[in-house]
Every structure is written in structure tokens, then in C-alpha cells.
């Protein structure tokens, strides 16, 4: 591909509402492969920045690819600004990263963007591990995410394992998870939404999400769907971003995102699909969820 030297673009730049920084695969529905279509389904125009480029997710028997070279990754971010694509930017969505160096570069870039566009919403899904598999990124990346990305975020969507990792707290019960989330709020976050939350207090056959702000905490429950495709957190976070940008409150955004995610899981299970499916957004197919206000 040509370097572009000697070429001067004419006309108005292509403007992005959201910059989504996360993984990309050739086969599968994870990372930007689900975030981009989810955001577009809400009428948004995402700029897609890959952190890793893989043939598929690592749970398959073969895997090719890896993290993008740091110079490429940094160049992608710089060139979005250089092309004038961020003049109407409304949100930055961060998911899976490929290295600690990427986290540091991204943290500095977000800080510069926030200086120019202070209204931009920054949502970080700190993809680092889960209760079933433990930590599946390097300890260096986990530390860099904690130091460089959490301070830049307005909202965070860790799972229960990641909440414990970020805070060093016990998070198995609802009261413990709320206290841990509020420790993160003390770092400048507006809210924390914990997925697969407080599993010691979760009724059988249910899944819990916990939405925590400085003044309120709410627990959301829905039926567990008997399927476990990859990419559910990526889809939830993209949906959450879209609903917040549409003006929904945090509680309503979490509720709508959860309803669609359960619908997607039910569709995936019905089709016996190895990968997460994204059905059309049919209100008639919306799944039941239950909100439980907690004492503050």
C-alpha cells in the first residue's frame, strides 16, 4: 500500500461518533466484530481500531496472529486525529488490549482527546480474566490498565473477577461488590457496572449485574441461558455505550443492553451456534429482567 505521500485528500472528512479500541478476528464474533455492528445498528458511526488481529479466539485448536505492532497501533490513533475524523466524537470504547505498552499509549491518547473534546464519554471494559480461567493477560497489562486507563474512564464494566483484581477486595457477596466498586469510583469514575456480579449471593439459574454510582446501587437479574459463546461482554459494552449516547439513564441503559444480550444468547442457543449471534432488535422478543434497588 502507498504511504500516501504526495496525495492531498479533498472534501469533508468521514466523521466518527465512537472510536472502538479492541480485538478483531477473521472468524468469530468478539471484540470489534460484535461492537461495530452493534453500534451501527443504533445509527452510530464507529471508527474501528484493532489491538490484536487473530484468526479466531484462542479456545479453538488453531490460532494465528497476535498483537498489532506498537508503532502501527499508535499510528492508527494518531491518524484518526490527522484525518479530522474526531471532530464529532462522542465516545471512546476500550476493550481487549494486546500489551501493556498499548495500554500506556492509549491512556496518553485518551488524555489528549479529552483535552480537546472534554464532553467525550470514555467507557473501559477491562478485559483481563474471569472466574473460570483466571488471569488471561500478563500481569504487566493488568497493572498498566489499572494505572493508565481506569483514571481516564467515566465508566467501567468489569466482571466479578476483574473487579476483585482491580481493587484487591473480596467481591463474592453483593455488599462486598458494591464496596469494591465504590473504591473505583473514588478514582474519578462516574459509575461501575459489574457483570456476573456477586456470585455467592446469586440464585441458581440466574445471572446478576450490579450498577453502582456514588449515590445508588442497583442489582439486575435475568435468567441464565445455557450457552457460553465468547464476546458477550463486548456486545454488552457496545450496547451500553449506544444507549447512554441516546440519552438513557445508566439503569435504563443497563436494562436495555441486558435484554438484548439475553435475546442474543437465546438465539445463539436455539441455532446451536459456536459463535454469538446478533438477532434483529425485536421488542416482542425482549427478555425479562428484574431490578433490585439496594440500600445505599
From Swiss-Prot:
Substrate binds at residues 23, 59, 234. It catalyses: pyridoxal + ATP = pyridoxal 5'-phosphate + ADP + H(+); pyridoxine + ATP = pyridoxine 5'-phosphate + ADP + H(+); pyridoxamine + ATP = pyridoxamine 5'-phosphate + ADP + H(+). Pathway: Cofactor metabolism; pyridoxal 5'-phosphate salvage; pyridoxal 5'-phosphate from pyridoxal: step 1/1; Cofactor metabolism; pyridoxal 5'-phosphate salvage; pyridoxine 5'-phosphate from pyridoxine: step 1/1; Cofactor metabolism; pyridoxal 5'-phosphate salvage; pyridoxamine 5'-phosphate from pyridoxamine: step 1/1. GO terms for biological process: pyridoxal 5'-phosphate salvage. Its EC number is 2.7.1.35. GO terms for molecular function: ATP binding; hydroxymethylpyrimidine kinase activity; magnesium ion binding; pyridoxal kinase activity; zinc ion binding. Its cofactor is Mg(2+). Mg(2+) binds at residues 136, 162. Gene3D superfamilies: 3.40.1190.20. InterPro entries: PdxK (IPR023479), PM/HMP-P_kinase-1 (IPR013749), PyrdxlKinase (IPR004625), Ribokinase-like (IPR029056). It comes from the Bacteria. GO terms for cellular component: cytosol. Keywords: ATP-binding, Kinase, Magnesium, Metal-binding, Nucleotide-binding, Transferase, Zinc. ATP binds at residues 125, 157, 162, 195, 222-225, 232. B6-vitamer kinase involved in the salvage pathway of pyridoxal 5'-phosphate (PLP). Catalyzes the phosphorylation of pyridoxine (PN), pyridoxal (PL), and pyridoxamine (PM), forming their respective 5'-phosphorylated esters, i.e. PNP, PLP and PMP. PANTHER family: PYRIDOXAL KINASE, PYRIDOXINE_PYRIDOXAL_PYRIDOXAMINE KINASE. Belongs to the pyridoxine kinase family. PdxK subfamily. Homodimer. This is Pyridoxine/pyridoxal/pyridoxamine kinase.
Amino acid at each position: 500500500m502507498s504511504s500516501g505521500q504526495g496525495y492531498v485528500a479533498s472534501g469533508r472528512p468521514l466523521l466518527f461518533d465512537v472510536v472502538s479500541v479492541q480485538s478483531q478476528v477473521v472468524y468469530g464474533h468478539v471484540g470489534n466484530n460484535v461492537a461495530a455492528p452493534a453500534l451501527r445498528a443504533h445509527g452510530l458511526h464507529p471508527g474501528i481500531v484493532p489491538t490484536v488481529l487473530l484468526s479466531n479466539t484462542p479456545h479453538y485448536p488453531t490460532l494465528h496472529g497476535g498483537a498489532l505492532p506498537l508503532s502501527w497501533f499508535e499510528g492508527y490513533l494518531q491518524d484518526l486525529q490527522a484525518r479530522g475524523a474526531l471532530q464529532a466524537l462522542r465516545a471512546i470504547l476500550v476493550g481487549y488490549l494486546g500489551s501493556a505498552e498499548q495500554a500506556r499509549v492509549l491512556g496518553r491518547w485518551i488524555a489528549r482527546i479529552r483535552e480537546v473534546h472534554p464532553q467525550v464519554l470514555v467507557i473501559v471494559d477491562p478485559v483481563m480474566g474471569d472466574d473460570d480461567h483466571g488471569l488471561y493477560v500478563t500481569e504487566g497489562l493488568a497493572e498498566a490498565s489499572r494505572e493508565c486507563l481506569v483514571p481516564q474512564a467515566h465508566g467501567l464494566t468489569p466482571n466479578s473477577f476483574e473487579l476483585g483484581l482491580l481493587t484487591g477486595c473480596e467481591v463474592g457477596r453483593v455488599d462486598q461488590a458494591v464496596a469494591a466498586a465504590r473504591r473505583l469510583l473514588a478514582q474519578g469514575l462516574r459509575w461501575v457496572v459489574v457483570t456476573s456480579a456477586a456470585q455467592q449471593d446469586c440464585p441458581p439459574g440466574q445471572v446478576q449485574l450490579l450498577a453502582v454510582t456514588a449515590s445508588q446501587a442497583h442489582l439486575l437479574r435475568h435468567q441464565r441461558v445455557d450457552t457460553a459463546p465468547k464476546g458477550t461482554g463486548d456486545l454488552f459494552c457496545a450496547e451500553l455505550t449506544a444507549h447512554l449516547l441516546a440519552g438513557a439513564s445508566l439503569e435504563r441503559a443497563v436494562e436495555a443492553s441486558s435484554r438484548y444480550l439475553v435475546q442474543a444468547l437465546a438465539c445463539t442457543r436455539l441455532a446451536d451456534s459456536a459463535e454469538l449471534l446478533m438477532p434483529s432488535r425485536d421488542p416482542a422478543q425482549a427478555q425479562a429482567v428484574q431490578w433490585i434497588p439496594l440500600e445505599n
